[in-house]
Each structure stands twice: as structure tokens, then as C-alpha cells.
Amino acid sequence: MANNPGAKKAIRKIARRTEVNTARRSRVRTFLRKFEDAIAKGDVAVAKAAFVEAQSELMRAVSKGVVHPNTGSRKVSRLAARLKKLDKAAA
């Protein structure tokens, strides 16, 4: 348990940041789920729109420090590969 005022304040700050970061991470997962659903349905147009939104949200999380840059890039790369595969299959 924190004994001095500075440590108590740090605990309060950490709790606030954790709440914000959890919300951001949840938002990213929501957009990733929308992309997954579009891929599962096989709808290329919806998947492309969902990809743009998911990529934007992932990169925003990276810039805010919620997701490591390499993790964000890896996820975007894998999403793009899946979209490309779906696009080829549909064509």
C-alpha cells in the first residue's frame, strides 16, 4: 500500500490511464471484429471499408502507446493479406 502522497497520486493516475487504455483496446477489438465478420461473409466492399477503419484505429492505438508499434504493424499487415486473399478469391 502507498504510504506517501506522491505514491497515492501515482496510484490514482495509473487507475485513470488503465481505464482509458482499456477503452481504447476494446475499441480496437471492436473494429477488428467488424473486419473479421466482413471477411467471414465474403463481402469484399464491406471488408475493404472495415479494413480502413480497423487500420486507422490500430494505428491510433499505436500512437497513443496502447499497442506496441511492431504489434500494430504486424496486425495491419495480416489484415491486409487476408483482404488481398479474399479479393483474389472473389475476382
UniProtKB/Swiss-Prot annotation:
Gene Ontology annotations for the cellular component aspect, listed alphabetically: cytosol; small ribosomal subunit
GO biological process: translation
Domain of life the protein comes from: Bacteria
GO MF terms, alphabetically ordered: small ribosomal subunit rRNA binding; structural constituent of ribosome
Key words of the record: Ribonucleoprotein, Ribosomal protein, RNA-binding, rRNA-binding
Pfam families listed in its UniProt record: Ribosomal_S20p
Role of this protein: Binds directly to 16S ribosomal RNA.
NCBIfam families reported in the protein's UniProt record: S20
Family, similarity comment: Belongs to the bacterial ribosomal protein bS20 family.
Protein name: Small ribosomal subunit protein bS20
Organism from which the protein derives: Caulobacter vibrioides (strain NA1000 / CB15N) (Caulobacter crescentus)
Gene: rpsT
